[in-house]
Amino acid sequence: MIKYVVIIPARLKSTRLPNKPILKIKGKPLIYWTWKNCVKAFDAKKVYVATDDNQIKTVCNEFNINVIMTSAKCKTGTDRIAEASKNRFKDHLIINVQ
């Protein structure tokens, strides 16, 4: 069986829509809805949010969403996923959800 993980990169410093991951839609943050749709297709234990921001981490913890903290040096979502998976998921298929 193929080992896999789903990683959702998230940051608050978007120029087009600041704080996007924690903006609320129907009373819940956008990052929750992204995660919720991922767990419809994948095992929740294998879905992670990769972020450098403690506010996003706090929101994820409120909803029992797996979080991987990354450095603020990541310039793109793909960079963040690469850093998050580098040592932890070497032999896994990485599914990038952006």
Annotate each predicted stretch with a short phrase.
Residues 2-50:
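N-terminal glycine-rich phosphate-binding loop and ensuing alpha1 helix
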Residues 54-98:
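Short phosphate-binding loop-to-helix
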